[in-house]
Amino acid sequence: MIGSIAFLSAILLFSMTASSAFAHMRQLLTVGGKHYLLEVGSQVEPPYVGDKNGVQFFAWTPDPKDPLNDSAKGIKNITGLDKTVTVIVSAGPVSKRLDFTPSPSNTAEYDTTFYPTAQTTYTYTLVGKINNTPIHISYRCVPGAGDDTPGNNTKATVSPGVVRDMVAGGYACPIPKVSIP
């Protein structure tokens, strides 16, 4: 009986944490001549206007055989980016720069907290340096987006020394809370 309760508790805990961050946008980038897989989205999906949320950022050296797969065998976590990268959260004409904190449970993860205050398009822009190269990389929410949002393999220069090789997935824009009477 106790074993069954522990098993069910573990499943419940996993399902709650797994559903809290399922929609992120992945970009395969060449920064200063080196490949990086950067993934950005909201900490809680979908984000609700007025509720605590935040930006969740992951950084890896990609597996050359499967470069957009954040679970690929040859992927390597990138640490220390909280010292060189910040995020600008923009909603229309209003923006705020926030610092990242490294996750204690995942060395590839960086987080920051904010409260979405409007139902509008939010842009998370990573700024700072990666591989000693200045970056300015934007991720824009898309209403109803998720990990299955179609990708794009068109190369594009994002900023000097930064080329986007591929992009896939997406994260949803904030939606209003529904009140239950």
Feature roles, as predicted:
Residues 21-181:
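N-terminal soluble domains immediately following signal/targeting peptides that reside
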Residues 11-20:
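C-terminal segment of classical bacterial N-terminal signal peptides
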Residues 1-8:
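Bacterial N-terminal signal peptides that target proteins for export
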